[in-house]
Amino acid sequence: MSKALLHLHFLSLFLLCCVCHSSIFTLNFHFTGIVACRPHQIQAFTKFTNEFDTRGCNNSDTFNGVWCDNSTGAVAVLQLRKCLSGTLKSNSSLFGFHQLRYVDLQNNNLTSSSLPSGFGNLKRLEGLFLSSNGFLGQVPSSFSNLTMLAQLDLSYNKLTGSFPLVRGLRKLIVLDLSYNHFSGTLNPNSSLFELHQLRYLNLAFNNFSSSLPSKFGNLHRLENLILSSNGFSGQVPSTISNLTRLTKLYLDQNKLTSSFPLVQNLTNLYELDLSYNKFFGVIPSSLLTLPFLAHLALRENNLAGSVEVSNSSTSSRLEIMYLGSNHFEGQILEPISKLINLKHLDLSFLNTSYPIDLKLFSSLKSLRSLDLSGNSISSASLSSDSYIPLTLEMLTLRHCDINEFPNILKTLKELVYIDISNNRMKGKIPEWLWSLPLLQSVTLGNNYFTGFQGSAEILVNSSVLLLYLDSNNFEGALPDLPLSIKGFGVASNSFTSEIPLSICNRSSLAAIDLSYNNFTGPIPPCLRNLELVYLRNNNLEGSIPDALCDGASLRTLDVSHNRLTGKLPRSFVNCSSLKFLSVINNRIEDTFPFWLKALPNLQVLTLRSNRFYGPISPPHQGPLGFPELRIFEISDNKFTGSLPPNYFVNWKASSRTMNQDGGLYMVYEEKLFDEGGYGYTDALDLQYKGLHMEQAKALTSYAAIDFSGNRLEGQIPESIGLLKALIAVNISNNAFTGHIPLSMANLENLESLDMSRNQLSGTIPNGLGSISFLAYINVSHNQLTGEIPQGTQITGQSKSSFEGNAGLCGLPLKESCFGTGAPPMYHQKQEDKEEEEEEEEEEEEVLNGRAVAIGYGSGLLLGLAIAQVIASYKPEWLVKIIGLNKRRKR
């Protein structure tokens, strides 16, 4: 093969697989037409595939296989996508293919693998594609040996560390490190700025935190610069204007603060996204004159003023314009109406001083989506005789103070998505809505609707896929759902009676939320093939059906706060996708579900307030399984026995800190149609005695355990110190004995620690006093002795946190220790405050009035994730449904 033929770009790989049959053998192992591949190369390839489970290869990419050099017979191109399961080892036979030019191993299941340094031996590589494999750890320094490399894609892994060493990769054209856990600063001396051939750079969704070096301006060949969702701060360097070849510039979701960046020289710019920063000032008039600009996103900044649109801008190419959540004046509307090629427009939360008239958009004949949420809308413009572009497919009018159903929707025959939640509409939903021929997604939550007009048949036979009616005034029996329904949510209404069996006839149903109603009777045994099931806070009875895990698609099950009995279904062992399981506050009587350790993705297990009994240690007294578990909440049951010292050693996910995990969120999304779909992000309301912490989104780096209110005994396992991601530990009200493990001082992220009402002895480890985030500690009613550590976080606690230990002394207790050396004046001040402190303690059971709980809740909601705080005495998990990502994944 000639040298020119070997210089393949990524797309060329597909072409070669299509036209060069004489050089291909595929992974179904029908070795036809393999004359060019030498026998020893075929044997080596077979040896490589034997290192993995290749059962997925039969249904994988049809272009999978290898391609050999016609002159040497050596493997030159290897593509195995969505095919391999296992571990890519450092001594893999892959690294013996020294003639390889292109390797594509994207979307395999290589979890728990570090990125092998052996790749550095493949010095002829020109393209290396390793995205979506779950690789851990740092990029080996041996990668700098790949001096021929032109394309490197390591995106969608779990790689950590600072920016990898790429010095020597001077031929690199494409570098994609997005969706990893890289952190640290980008300094001007970084090897990144030696890559002068670079055309595509994507560092999005990492944890870099620094200013943007001016040396970005030296990468003159850059065409795509994507730095979204990091911690970049400060000003955008003026040298960015040197990148005159840029077609895409994404700086969104950072902490950048400056006036509008200098982009007027970027005459090739096609997409510009500066959303979710702190840019201020006005939009320069020159921006809208850029000849190729089609996508402009400036959401959630501090931009103000108006937008100047010259007469020539009526022929602007601008198709996407997102200006929501800024401080623009009302005059912005008229100039925008001149941008006649607009297809997607977001003007939400403009805070205009007058109602918006929808007629202003009548000139936008191509408009497909319009978001005016958070603005006052002229009631006259919502009537059926008003005008709005008939091309509209998506209309969002949340928080618009609308009190009557908009009849203008009757005219929108192209409408696919409608969200008019969080308004003041009441009465019944009009029958004509379900007659819109293309309607797929309807969100009417947080209004005052009481029912449906007309025949139920119209709704049943509609085209609706997603229907969300949360927080209204519906009551009575659940309506018959559309035959095509995929996601349905009616949380926080007053529905009664049993869940109808007709729901089982909706074969496409994937997500259902019936929480916070008054449903009675059993969970229908016919429910199956669902992904998200939220039934919490009803009056459901009977056992949890075995069929819920048919098809292994179940990802989240929350049946908390019902009257369920029986045992956990053993069929759950087949729920390979299950991440969240919550059965809090039921009457389930069972032993600890050790068998759930077979679930590879389980992150949250909450069994609180049931009738579970017996040991929670495996029969062999070894470590507990659950490598991905982060929230483990089993309080107020009847668990007994002791825990071995190595109990926690397999909890790999809880051992990784935020810096290692990058602070990613627990997110799930599914796209249903062109502009979006449904999804959810898991929100966390973590409240322990003395600590209240709210997160609208639950970071995957958080971990919490609660064993309180059981009959556990023996020593606290020393291995608890391995769980560096722990922010909350509650083992109170048990019979633990022995010393507090010294290893707990390693829990540097710990914010709440409750070990009260046990039989612990010895001293409080001094290391606990140096945990900087520890906002609450309670070791009362044990048998502890000695001086209380005098770290800042300890001495600030209430004295009730240490009472009931006859041998304890030192602040904040009034019993002083001999030789503490505390200043007499300090002791006097403490005595002066005693009476006041005692009165305060009578009024508050927890520090600063913060209650004990980890809140769990659920709600299907298409649109933005809205954090909902549900306070109770013990930990719960708050799961929210979000959806419609109109731009791209966050």
UniProtKB/Swiss-Prot annotation:
Compartment(s) of residence: Cell membrane
Main location: membrane
Induction cue: By mannitol.
Signal peptide: 1-22
TM regions (residue ranges): 851-871
One Gene Ontology term of the molecular function aspect: protein kinase binding
Domain of life: Eukaryota
InterPro entries for the chain: Leu-rich_rpt, Leu-rich_rpt_typical-subtyp, LRR_dom_sf, LRR_R13L4/SHOC2-like, RLP23-like
Topological domains annotated Cytoplasmic: 872-890
Gene deletion effect: Impaired in nlp20-mediated immunity.
Membrane-protein topology: Single-pass type I membrane protein
GO BP of this protein: defense response to bacterium; defense response to fungus; defense response to oomycetes; detection of molecule of fungal origin; innate immune response-activating signaling pathway; pathogen-associated molecular pattern receptor signaling pathway; response to mannitol; response to molecule of bacterial origin
Glycosylation sites (chain numbering): 58, 70, 91, 109, 145, 189, 207, 242, 265, 311, 351, 461, 505, 518, 574, 730, 778
LRR repeat ranges, renumbered to this chain: 97-121, 123-145, 146-171, 173-195, 196-218, 220-243, 244-268, 270-290, 291-316, 318-339, 340-363, 364-389, 391-411, 412-436, 438-461, 462-485, 487-506, 507-527, 528-551, 553-575, 577-598, 599-623, 626-650, 699-724, 726-747, 748-771, 773-796
Subunit-structure text: Directly interacts with a 20-mer fragment (nlp20) from NLPs through its extracellular LRR domain. Component of a trimeric complex composed of RLP23, SOBIR1 and BAK1. BAK1 is recruited into a pre-formed RLP23-SOBIR1 complex in a ligand-dependent manner. Interacts with SOBIR1.
Family assignment from sequence similarity: Belongs to the RLP family.
Name the UniProt record assigns to this protein: Receptor like protein 23
